[in-house]
Amino acid sequence: MEAEAAAAVVASSASASASAGRSRPSSSAAQVTSNSAVRAGEENAASLYVLSVIDSLKKRITADRLTYIKNRIGENKTNISSYTQRTYNLSKNRQISTSKGTDSASNLLTKRQDDALCTLHSLDIIPVDKDGGTFQDESPFSSSNVMFGGNLGPKNAIIRPIKLPEVPKLPPYTTWIFLDRNQRMTEDQSVLGRRRIYYDTSCGEALICSDSEDEAIEDEEEKKEFKHSEDHIIRMTVQECGMSDAVLQTLARHMERAADDIKARYEILHGEKTKDSCKKGTEHNVKVEDLYCDKDLDAALDSFDNLFCRRCLVFDCKLHGCSQDLVFPTEKQPAWSGVDDSVPCGIHCHKLASEPDAAAGADHMLFDVEEPTHSSDNVMNQPGSNRKKNGSSGRKTKSQQSESSSTARVISESSDSEVHPISNKSPQHSPSPSKVKIGPKGGIRKITNRRIAERILMSVKKGQREMASSDSNFVSGYLLARDMKLRSDTRNGNKELIVSSQQSSPSTRSSKKKSTPQIGNSSAFAEAHNDSTEEANNRHSATDGYDSSRKEEFVNENLCKQEVYLRSWKAIEQGLLVKGLEIFGRNSCLIARNLLGGMKTCKDVFQYMNYIENNSASGALSGVDSLVKGYIKGTELRTRSRYFRRRGKVRRLKYTWKSAGYNFKRITERKDQPCRQYNPCGCQSTCGKQCPCLSNGTCCEKYCGCPKICKNRFRGCHCAKSQCRSRQCPCFAADRECDPDVCRNCWVGCGDGTLGVPNQRGDNYECRNMKLLLKQQQRVLLGRSDVSGWGAFLKNSVSKHEYLGEYTGELISHKEADKRGKIYDRENSSFLFNLNNEYVLDAYRMGDKLKFANHAPDPNCYAKVIMVTGDHRVGIFAKERILAGEELFYDYRYEPDRAPAWARKPEASGAKDDGQPFNGRAKKLAQNNRG
């Protein structure tokens, strides 16, 4: 029994625990359900609150709108009542004046007719006889007599009207814009995807021109703009309820827009409000210069790169467009240099700033170099003056320093005793020089002494440079650097003097003996050197500690100045300096004047360049500084290579007649194919198979980035005098005009020799293959044509093959030309001209007067597509001698299957039905004179 009772207890406890376990999940699920219900209720409450806010805003906007409409209606009612009252008063006054007339029943129209007839005094009035006969003159312009009744003249008078002769109507004329050069079509002028409406003269109504009746036009999605009321609701709702997803969704449902659009619109509105509040009072104080100070040169020139055309050298080029691909040439032009580099550019020029310091340094060094003997005056006075004039005119360039150091090295090896003692003289302990008479060979001694002194000064300069570079790499090129060098050179030179005097070898002594006889009184010269050496050694121990402390002060001061000075150079100033080095070389005067005007002076530019050059070995340069150093080295290398070329023979180009006629083979192969559009390549080396020009079948031009030795580059001609109008000229044979930048003898100038070109000596000495480039066209007149419509006429007589003018127009694609040509064909006109494989010229809206030149099977002109500085252009030339006043005709040369009926040849007119449609649009072609 006890066991059964225990089992029952265990079972009941297990069932209780199981029921408890089942009740826990059910309670948690109920809690989750209650939380979701609470959250849903909160969201509903929030959405209801947002809706209430939106409704209140709508009601407020509606009330404001109603008030505004009522006010406008009241204002309009007042204005209309005043206007109608004035009109009513005028009508009433007219009625009163009419009622006062004698004949109240008279018709106003009849009265006006009588008044009008009474004013016709120029008409012939013929009286009528009693028998009814009249006197008439026989005239071709007379017509039947008309009898007028009324008060004009005698009763039953007959008036003979005048019949004007018939004048033919003027031909239809289209308004067009004159173009002196071709221009690319803008996107808004395209007719693709649009329906064209034209007037059909046969049926007398306007029709829609389309390629097919089922042509579907893609309708662009209408972009709904936000109204002012919607902006107000969005702004006020977000301010009242905050920016949340529920608010955005409610606004989107209410306005039937996307939630992202609502959010973007609010950000725009909020940004405009913040921007307007921040810019109040400070907009007009911002300078244009301050906008670019913190930018890099590339960022500042972003708009320049997009708007400036490097082929036409104009801004906003209509031919090549904006945002062209930048092509940087591999070969840079040599740096330009001024006429006289020794003339200072201004009061802040580095030449003026460095002359006093250099002169003072020279005096400090040369004061003790004078010998105490009788020959010292002749030895050292002349070199001192030469050094003040020539040696201390400022900092030398790197090449001059290297030359002086090499010279000093040779002198020091030959005469070491002449260098070290003299370089360590001090001006405070030097003995006074004595005056001695000069012997009969004094002139020779003067010259010899001068040369020796110059060598000594060059060796001293070498020692200064070596000691200064060993002491500090950051001191040279800035203020007080020269004084620090002199102090360190004096101390170190004394040490070298002691070592060299104690450890002199017999060979050195023998060299001394060989060199001292060149100077008069060698014993006195040696005694002076020994005395100066002892005095320098005595001074060295006393001033060593003082000089070392002063040196540390100078170094620390100069380092601080350099750091502050380098921070003052902004990014755009460093970029302009790099450009200046590329254009003008190391000429700091031209760089400061042309690129850094108002920012940095000539002295600042000079010091910065020296700092970059002297500290490049330490590896502390970065960014623009290393780039400046690269340009400095590159400029020196280019200058040196040009120097060696001038010393040698004249460098001849690797140019043969075979390479000059490289394009002739291509011409003959593609005789019947259209010209290829040229696009510059950006190759940085000799063009290979990947070159776009080579793959496109065109030659590389001067606008390409490849070097001049590229085999695919067109090299121009070497024609002499006026031989460029024959097929011996490579340019003329390739249907190109000569380019003054490429062709050797084809000059372009003012004719007076001011630009370095030969003086103009008549027509036989100038290139005659640059007519389109120089715009040397004939005068063309516009008049009524005897063939059709308007025509072009020549004002002056011309000879055969003379250039008349250019056929200009819009550059459009072939697809665009097919669409436009359908309208032109229906109007029986043609203004399309095939230019190359990409573009067609359309002169309907824009062009020159030669667009009116008509077609003729036997013309007196011909058209020719010519490449002029990389662009294809159409020139009109005389096929025969044309007299003044003759009309110009040329063969449009339509393709046989696309020519209209009036342009087909007589023998081919019946081969094809005139009413049969043809594929494509009729386009003019240039004459092929490549034969």
UniProtKB/Swiss-Prot annotation:
One of its GO terms (molecular function) is chromatin binding. It is found in: Nucleus. Residues 386-398 have a biased composition (Basic residues). Belongs to the class V-like SAM-binding methyltransferase superfamily. Histone-lysine methyltransferase family. EZ subfamily. The keyword Repressor applies. Residues 664-763 form the CXC domain. Residues 1-37, 372-450, 491-549, 903-931 are annotated as: Disordered. The keyword S-adenosyl-L-methionine applies. It comes from the Eukaryota. Keywords: Methyltransferase, Nucleus, Repressor, S-adenosyl-L-methionine, Transcription, Transcription regulation, Transferase. It comes from Zea mays (Maize). This is Histone-lysine N-methyltransferase EZ1. Widely expressed. Residues 528-549, 903-915 have a biased composition (Basic and acidic residues). Residues 778-893 form the SET domain. Coiled coil: none annotated. GO terms for biological process: heterochromatin formation; methylation; regulation of long-day photoperiodism, flowering.
